[in-house]
Curated annotation (Swiss-Prot):
Contains G-L-F-G repeats. The FG repeat domains in Nup98 have a direct role in the transport. There is a cross-link at K563, K603, K665 (Glycyl lysine isopeptide (Lys-Gly) (interchain with G-Cter in SUMO2)). This is Nuclear pore complex protein Nup98-Nup96. The modification N6-acetyllysine is found at K603. It is an enzyme of class 3 (hydrolase). The gene is NUP98.
């Protein structure tokens, strides 16, 4: 590569960089002398040398203590990685037999000579850094060791001085039913002949007596220390990580190895760098790290036991695979096995005994034999079958290569592959660039970068990149050592190769749990595992031969504790499941971690209906989906969610029930309901497997319990409780048989209080479950015929009442009512110890109570308290669905710990605390965010690979091409590359690994821009799920999801992707009143979240918004970063989000919806332009079961939606009656073309509204809304209406009198509004607590009734005190003094709080401090109207105005500190009593208030903001209900309140008009639009609305509406006809279009339409009257003058028709000559004008020809009549005898076709000849 003059690589004989030494020798980097790091430093001439130490013959020391040119007997490597037997000098001049990096004979860390930095002292035998012994003297004469190695004495060897060599034997192995004789080795040192007379204890004692264990003497006392000064001990000289020494290389005084265990580093007894197999000890991570071997130690050569390159009998590779006795290279390459590559020949880097990458032996990515850390499997390579390299030859999965050629085209191969695919050909000179990457030049085998072995081949070696070297055949670049010859030249090679094969067979026996050669980690701690099964055990062999589910697969990559996930499988381990399945069974479960093997339960898989041919791989004990994926817990079910039941019988559940495992938690079982079974559960999913996402576990609470492994009771949490079938019928029909449940009162007491009707109505009912919690229902509860077993489910951290929403009664009935829930045992779990945190201090530190409060608020509950002692979480709910603490809630503030796994194009996983609303599950619960697990669990990684031909990549972070945005639950789109790979049958992950190796990371771009579906989502979308691209969806949907849109969309957006059809409706249906705020709603509306939720999937209860604010209108376009569509551009099925704004849903007028997504459930497309039946479509749409994708998603649907169901007639009156009242009090101005309606000034309309609403508030469907309307109109009447008291006065009353009268009227309004609540409270408290009833009367200023009640209850002093209230101010002062005295004497502690409340009220004190540090608040538990009334009546003097009382009340609820706030906020009526917290929107100064409060503010401040007052949310929960808002605005306009902005007014007018239009009252919508001030906007809006609704077919209803528009609203009739013309044009009805255009006075358009479409048909059909009717109407000059081309078009037709009629008239009646003259003139005129008619079609030309022909005949007739024959002749007039001179000029101008023209010519010719004949006579 660099020409021959550069010699070998860095000093080797075949180096790539020269032939002379760095420091002036005759080689560049050292073919004949020491290289840069080679053996000789300054000048001796060698045969070879190199940077990394190829063999040299004359090395010299740095300081030249001995000669610079001592002869050497062998070679040495620069870093000591090769063999070295030549003599050399050490760094400090001590002679040695070979040199390396640190001047010892052997490699750098396993010296046999004194080291440069070793110990300082006497000569002794010591161990190198990695374990080999040396027996030389140190320069300072002391016993020395290697760089870090401990020293040992030179005493006579006793004990185990002879290296362990296991005796061999034979045994029988049964595989696939065939018995095979195999060789065995006895892995016990006492089995050797040398030690067969001794026991293990004796050998150990001799080792101890030989001081092979224990500290050495200090420096200068006969021994030396290591590099860091601690006392090394004699040892058997093993390595840093796998030595059997008792003192570490760093010698800190502990009797441990380098990592502190009593054994080797990674679990082997005498292992190499990373540990050869140790039989009886454990590793750093408490797992055996390899298989037991027969070696003692290795150097740094990753597999050799002696010095570099020397033969060794049995060694371990880098990761512990044993190899036979043979020389080993840097990575343990077995030089006798015709392989010499760096990464996997013999026992190379990854422990293989065969050729490099892709050979039959094993490869880096395609090993066929050896597996993970010392165990072996039989699997096919990923990129090739039997001989392919990483990118190399013969891949079966095909990347387009041919046999024996590499993919990269770097040459051809013949026998083995290097890493880049080229093979050396024996005896050849290489092939170009291909040779540069490994083709040996004259060598038999190439190593990683071209290092060759002196095997069968020519005399020349290859350089680093293929360049030839001439002086040596053993030089390497440092990644391999010179190897001994192969079988042809080495007599030991054959035996070594046989030993290697034997080792492979042994590894199969020793490793029953599989192996992955790519990522090797320590195995689990044997202390926590049962004793390993003996590999030759007949039972084990029988299990191996039983065809089951799993192939040989790796253990979990780390010591994990996977949480038990809910699944249809069982919780039992399956030790030998699937050990001998065929390769196709590996499709989904091959290289995935399996769970604990502690329990051996062999399950008959044939009993389960889960295992269809496609998805049977996905469900078993340790299916990959059961492991926590990056801390998140999901179970990918192969059946619908409602079929997630136990499938294997009671015996499995029993075993699961009593089975606990610290490693694998039992899988909670759920009962199987017979009603939920599906007949299609066995159907095969025939879609592209890689694109099918399975239905996720919808209920995160039921999926797993946090304490499953620690509490027996929690094992039952997610199963139905065992029922006691022996029970007696309750007289009231109440059923409660589940064990552990109780009621207060008890069931017996309930039976006693059952009345004679069989009804059981109990007050303050409680139902609970021992140890779990209870539910307390306040008030009277009717328990008659309630099946509490089915209704109430109290589980760990969860309570469910009414599982089925369809069976849930309305709010307030049954148990769906307000309640107080107490859940016991709610403690968080410590992430480290997995124990419950019960310490109150620690709970306070982590703010667990605050977390529970946040969870309560999120679920719509009101948090009450948390009791750490019992873990009781107490909260109140307004109605029931499901409440509880999910694992995601408990750990939402935890962040997963970082893992230090190898990165392969990774992307960081976002923290779990940034969950977005779109990640909420469809059942209303947020999808569980990632849980913070133990570090071992988190190191498990997130990739779930289910392909058989992929190696273990559980330690790999996920590829960012697999990262997907979190859809509901665990649904993600699939990357395009995955889709392509899966479609072609290629392993997607293989493709991803190739991409990661070749391509750089791509920038994250938004999906709306690059239109790809596999990129990372936006910042807000965290909580990512990473799924395997091959996860089958529900089996029940496989028959519906055939390949429809290329397979890419079907699995993503079928019903299985979101909800199973069997559960979608039942699970999602909830009463709309409870769907959002969990509060009683006053209408069919509930409080909606912000508007953005309309464009997302419907979410059932209880998704509670944290804020309740009014809708805010955006005045401009929302920035893209803040838009709800940001980052959602890839959501194909949601056309509101796909492609950003370009594909957003189009909302049209009249609530029409144009979208290209799926048609909404229940709606109909608008066909034939008829309004389809409206579907129920609330502000939040009803849940819709997603249908399978059966057509293109880009078909546009036009649908008609409505806010509610069709209204009954009486409900429609709520719309029409107030509009009629408004029209009655309005004036229509017709000064302009478009009429303008303005309200009449005055207050008369207010009284009409008030009178009407009082009558209408009876039994209407919307009684609650009308009731609020009544309060509003009566308040307007009190504030601005006529006062009867003032109307009787003749003179204008003074302002003071007006203020007092308004106060009285407002006071009466307050009393009336409080009456219903007061009556209800008095009825509840009159008997038990009359004092409370008295206070209720006082809140309505019903003082006389309060006095009477006090007297009736015997409280005469209170009655007397109440009667004085109407007196002077002195009564209040005296009461205040009395309260002060009681406070000073602390006597108030003995007075009832309710009584003190009355005293404080009468004293005018809203808040009174008691002596016991309590407060009496007179406004507590009062609505805002009564709180305001208290301020007006009791806290202010009688002369105070309304404004002053309102100001004082505002201070009561607006104080910044909670301690000073004593009154409730003026919430709208639909929110009163809901218990919800109203949070003000950030940066908003307009909190939500009641409309009545706004009216009071406007009365007090004339310039108060009208926009707040007219906001619909201040009136009703429906933000689109503008009925009252618009009428209020018109009333305020009549009162001269005109400071509403033009934009807000326009929105108000248009919104109310749209609402009326959607209800079918479009004529009243025009009435509303006629109030718009801007004439242009008004006219445009009215005309557009007319265009949408005017019908061509006249009916009595349409006629009445048109009459209303034209007569009452004075809408121009021509506008209506114009709208009809547009509709006729749309329907292609030309006749009606022309008629409507004529009526709309569009003369020109009408004429144009007639000429182009109607005239020709009329002429051809001789329908002259029809055409004449149109043309005569257009003929008047005032009209025809406005028509273009009237003279040459319409008038020609009209004259033609008139000529025909005149001729008929002349023929019927005798006419004068004047008439004939006129007719002659018209006919001759037509002859010249007919040709001017413009023809647009063949029909027009036909009509023109007919007209010309007929005109020609008319002309003859007229001329014959006008010129009769001579009187002498008796002949009658003959048209054929007309003089030619009169006829020919006109006939020639007529446009006639050829046949007509020929007839006319023939006639003219005959006339001409006749005239000639006559003239000749």
């Amino acid at each position: 590569m660099f020409n021959k003059s550069f010699g070998t690589p860095f000093g080797g004989g075949t180096g790539g960089f020269g032939t002379t030494s760095t420091f002036g020798q005759n080689t560049g980097f050292g073919t004949t002398s020491g290289g840069a790091f080679g053996t000789s430093a300054f000048g001796s001439s060698n045969n070879t040398g190199g940077l990394f130490g190829n063999s040299q013959t004359k090395p010299g020391g740095l300081f030249g203590t001995s000669s610079f040119s001592q002869p050497a007997t062998s070679t040495s490597t620069g870093f000591g990685f090769g063999t070295s037997t030549g003599t050399a000098n050490t760094l400090f001049g001590t002679a040695s037999t070979g040199t390396s990096l640190f001047s010892s004979q052997n490699n750098a860390f396993a010296q046999n000579k004194p080291t440069g930095f070793g110990n300082f002292g006497t000569s002794t035998s010591s161990g190198g850094l990695f374990g080999t012994t040396n027996t030389t003297s140190n320069p300072f004469g002391s016993t020395s060791g290697s760089l870090f190695g401990p020293s040992s004495f030179t005493a006579a060897p006793t004990g185990t001085t002879i290296k362990f060599n296991p005796p061999t034997g034979t045994d029988t192995m049964v595989k696939a039913g065939v018995s095979t004789n195999i060789s065995t080795k006895h892995q016990c040192i006492t089995a050797m002949k040398e030690y067969e007379s001794k026991s293990l204890e004796e050998l150990r004692l001799e080792d101890y007596q030989a001081n092979r264990k224990g500290p050495q003497n200090q420096v200068g006392a006969g021994t030396t220390t290591g590099l860091f000064g601690s006392s090394p001990a004699t040892s058997s000289a093993t390595g840093l990580f796998s030595s059997s020494t008792t003192n570490s290389g760093f010698a800190y005084g502990q009797n441990k190895t380098a990592f502190g265990t009593s054994t080797t580093g990674f679990g082997t007894n005498p292992g190499g760098l990373f540990g050869q197999q140790n039989q009886q000890t454990t590793s750093l991570f408490s797992k055996p790290f390899g298989q037991a071997t027969t070696t003692q130690n290795t150097g740094f050569s990753f597999g050799n036991t002696s010095t570099i390159g020397q033969p060794s009998t049995n060694t371990m590779g880098l990761f512990g695979v044993t190899q036979a006795s043979q020389p080993g290279g840097l990575f343990g390459t077995a030089t006798n096995t015709s392989t010499g590559t760096a990464f996997g020949t013999g026992t190379g880097l990854f422990g293989q005994t065969n050729t490099g990458f892709g050979a039959v032996g094993s490869t880096l990515f395609g090993n066929n034999k050896l597996t993970t850390f010392g165990s072996s499997t039989t699997s096919a390579p990923s990129f090739g079958t039997t001989s392919g390299g990483l990118f190399g030859n013969k891949p079966t999965l095909t990347l387009g290569t041919n046999t024996n050629t590499s993919n990269f085209g770097f040459g051809t191969n013949t026998s083995g592959n290097s890493i880049f695919g080229s093979k050396p050909a024996p005896g050849t000179l290489g092939t170009g660039l291909g040779a540069g990457f490994g083709t040996a030049l004259g060598a038999g085998q190439a190593s990683l970068f071209g290092n060759n072995q002196p095997k069968i081949g020519g005399p020349l070696g290859t350089g680093a990149f293929g360049a030839p070297g001439f002086n040596t055949t053993t030089a390497t670049l440092g990644f391999g050592a010179p190897q001994a010859p192969v079988a042809l030249t080495d007599p030991n090679a054959s035996a070594a190769q046989q030993a290697v094969l034997q080792q492979h067979i042994n590894s199969l026996t020793y490793s029953p749990f599989g192996d992955s050669p790519l990522f090797r980690n320590p195995m689990s701690d044997p202390k926590k595992k049962e004793e390993r099964l003996k590999p030759t055990n007949p039972a084990a062999q029988k299990a191996l031969t039983t065809p089951t589910h799993y192939k040989l697969t790796p253990r979990p990559a780390t010591r994990v504790r996977p949480k038990a996930l809910q699944t249809t499988g069982t919780a039992k381990s399956h030790l030998f499941d699937g050990l001998d399945d065929d390769e196709p069974s590996l499709a989904n479960g091959a290289f995935m971690p399996k769970k604990s093997i502690k329990k051996l339960v062999l399950k008959n898989l044939n009993n389960s209906n889960l295992f269809s041919p496609v998805n049977r791989d996905s469900e078993n004990l340790a299916s990959p989906s059961e492991y926590p994926e990056n801390g998140e817990r999901f179970s990918f079910l192969s059946k619908p969610v409602d079929e997630n039941h136990q499938q294997d019988g009671d015996e499995d559940s029993l075993v699961s029930h009593f089975y606990t495992n610290p490693i694998a938690k039992p899988i909670p079982q759920t009962p199987e309901s017979a009603g939920n079974k599906h007949s299609n559960s066995n159907s095969v999913d025939d879609t592209i497997v890689a694109l099918n996402m399975r239905a996720a576990l919808r209920n995160g609470l039921e999926g797993s319990s946090e304490e499953t492994s620690f509490h027996d009771e929690s094992l039952q949490d997610d199963r139905e409780e065992i029922e006691n079938n022996s029970y007696h019928m309750h007289p009231a029909g109440i059923i409660l048989t589940k064990v552990g449940y109780y009621t207060i009162p008890s069931m017996d007491d309930l039976a006693k209080i059952t009345n004679e009707k069989g009804e059981c109505i109990v007050s303050d009912f409680t139902i609970g479950r021992k140890g779990y919690g209870s539910i307390y229902f306040e008030g009277d509860v009717n328990l008659t015929n309630l099946n509490l077993d089915d209704i109430v489910h109290i589980r760990r951290k969860e309570v469910v009442v009414y599982l089925d929403d369809n069976q849930k009664p309305p709010v307030g009935e049954g148990l769906n009512r307000k309640a107080e829930v107490t859940l016991d045992g709610v403690w968080p779990t410590d992430k480290t110890s997995r124990c419950l945190i019960k310490s109150p201090d620690r709970l306070a530190d982590i703010n667990y109570e605050g977390r529970l409060e946040a969870v309560s608020r999120k679920q719509g509950a009101q948090f009450k308290e948390y009791r750490p002692e019992t873990g009781s979480w107490v909260f109140k709910v307004s109605h029931f669905s499901k409440y509880g603490l999910q694992d995601s809630d408990e750990e939402e503030e935890e962040h997963p710990s970082k893992t230090s796994t190898k990165k392969l194009k990774t992307a960081p996983l976002p923290p779990a605390s940034q969950t977005t609303p779109l990640q909420m599950a469809l059942n209303g619960k947020p999808a569980p965010p990632p849980q913070s697990q133990s570090p071992e669990v988190e190191q498990l990684g997130r990739v779930v690979e289910l392909d058989s031909d992929m190696v273990d990549i559980t330690q790999e972070p996920v590829l960012d091409t697999m990262l997907e945005e979190s859809m509901p639950e665990d649904q993600e789109p699939v990357s395009a590359s995955t889709h392509i790979a899966s479609s072609l049958g290629i392993n997607p992950h293989v493709l991803q690994i190739m991409k990661a190796s070749l391509l750089t990371d791509e920038e994250d771009v938004d999906m709306a821009l690059d239109q790809r579906f596999s990129r990372l989502p936006s910042k807000a979308d965290t909580s990512q799920e990473i799924c395997s691209p091959r996860l089958p969806i529900s089996a029940s949907h496989s028959s519906k999801t055939r390949s429809l849109v290329g397979g890419l969309l079907q699995s993503k957006f079928t019903s299985g992707a979101f909800l199973s059809p069997s559960v979608s409706v039942q699970e999602c249906r909830t009463p709309r009143a409870a769907s959002l705020m969990n509060i009683p709603s006053t209408s069919s509306w509930s409080v909606p979240p912000p508007l953005t939720s309309v464009f997302t999937m419907p979410s059932p209860a209880p998704e509670v918004p944290l804020k309740t604010v009014g809708t805010r209108r955006q005045l401009g376009l929302v920035p893209r970063e803040k838009s709800v569509t940001y980052g959602k551009g890839k959501l194909l099925m949601d056309m509101a989000l796909f492609m950003g704004r370009s594909f957003r849903v189009g909302w049209g007028p009249n609530w029409t919806l144009a979208n290209s997504g799926e048609q909404l459930n229940g709606s109909h497309e608008l066909e034939n332009h008829q309004i389809a039946d409206s579907m129920e479509f609330g502000f939040l749409p009803n849940p819709v079961a997603v249908k399978p994708l059966t057509e293109s998603p880009f078909k546009v649907h036009l649908e008609k939606l409505s806010l509610r169901q069709r209204k009954p007639d009486e409900d429609m009156k709520l719309y029409q009656t107030p509009l009629e009242l408004k029209l009655k009090h309005s004036t229509v101005h017709v000064d302009e073309l478009c009429p303008l309606i303005v309200p009449n000034l005055g207050v008369a309309v207010i009284h009409d509204y008030a009178d009407w609403v009082k009558e209408a508030s009876g039994d209407l469907p919307e009684a609650q809304i009308v009731k609020h309307w009544s309060l509003t109109w009566t308040l307007c009447e009190a504030l601005w209406g006529h006062l009867k008291e003032l109307d009787s006065q003749l003179n204008e009353p003074r302002e003071y009198i007006q203020i007092l009268e308004r106060r009285r009227a407002f006071s009466r309004w307050l009393s009336c509004t409080a009456t219903p609540q007061i009556e209800e409270e008095v009825s509840l408290t009159q008997k038990n607590s009359p004092v409370e009833a008295v206070f209720s009367y006082l809140t309505g200023k019903r003082i006389s009734e309060a006095c009477s009640l006090a007297q009736q209850s015997g409280d005469h002093r209170l009655a007397l005190l109440l009667s004085q209230f109407v007196g002077s101010q002195s009564v209040r002062e005296l009461l205040t003094m009395q309260l002060v005295d009681w406070h000073q004497l602390q006597a108030d502690s003995f007075i009832q709080d309710e009584r003190l409340r009355i005293f404080a009220l009468l004293a005018g004190k809203p808040v009174w401090q008691l002596s016991e540090k309590k407060q009496i608040n007179v406004c507590s538990q009062l609505d805002w109207k009564r709180s305001l009334a208290i301020h007006l009546w009791y806290l202010l003097p009688p002369t105070a105005s309304i404004s002053r009382a309102l100001s004082m009340y505002e201070e009561a609820f607006q104080n910044t500190s909670d301690s000073d706030r004593y009154a409730c906020s003026p919430l709208p009526s639909y929110l009163e009593g809901s218990g919800c917290v109203i949070a003000e929107e950030q940066n908003s100064q307009t909190p939500l208030r009641d409309v009545c409060f706004h009216l009071l503010k406007l009365y007090s401040d004339r310039h108060y903001d009208l926009n707040q007052l007219l906001e619909p949310r201040s009136i009703t929960a429906d933000p689109l209900d503008y009925r009252l808002s618009w009428h209020l605005w018109e009333v305020l306009r009549a009162l001269n309140y005109t400071h509403l902005s033009a934009q807000c007014e326009g929105v108000l007018q248009a919104s109310y008009a749209g609402q009326l239009e959607s209800e079918g009252l479009w004529e009243w919508a025009i009435f509303v639009l006629l109030h718009i001030d801007n004439s242009g906007i008004r006219e445009k809006a009215v005309r557009e609305l007319l265009t949408r609704h005017c019908q061509l077919l006249e009916t009595p209803e349409s006629w009445a509406k048109e009459t209303f528009l034209t007569q009452k609203l004075r809408v121009p009739a021509k506008w209506i006809h114009e709208a009809k013309a547009v509709r006729a044009h749309m329907e292609s009805d030309k006749h009606l279009e022309a008629l409507c255009l004529f009526k709309a006075e569009h003369w020109n358009r009408c004429h144009k339409l007639i000429i182009r479409h109607l005239a020709s048909d009329a002429i051809i059909n001789e329908n002259y009257d029809y055409l004449k009717g149109f043309l005569e109407d257009l003929a008047p000059p005032e009209r025809s003058s406005l028509i273009q081309d009237w003279e040459t078009s319409g008038l020609v037709y009209l004259d033609y028709i008139r000529v025909i009629e005149m001729l008929r008239h002349i023929q019927q009646v005798d006419c004068s000559g004047n008439d004939l003259e006129q007719l002659h003139i018209k006919v001759t005129s037509l002859c010249s004008r007919i040709e001017q008619i413009q023809c647009y079609s063949a029909k027009d030309r036909l009509a023109q020809s007919d007209m010309a022909k007929r005109v020609a005949n008319l002309l003859r007739v007229v001329l014959s009549l006008h010129h009769p024959p001579d009187r002498t002749s008796d002949s009658t007039p003959d048209p054929q005898r007309v003089p030619l001179r009169l006829l020919a000029p006109h006939i020639g101008r007529l446009p006639m076709p050829e046949d007509y023209a020929m007839d006319e010519l023939r006639s003219l010719t005959q006339s001409y000849l006749r005239e000639l004949a006559v003239g000749s006579l």
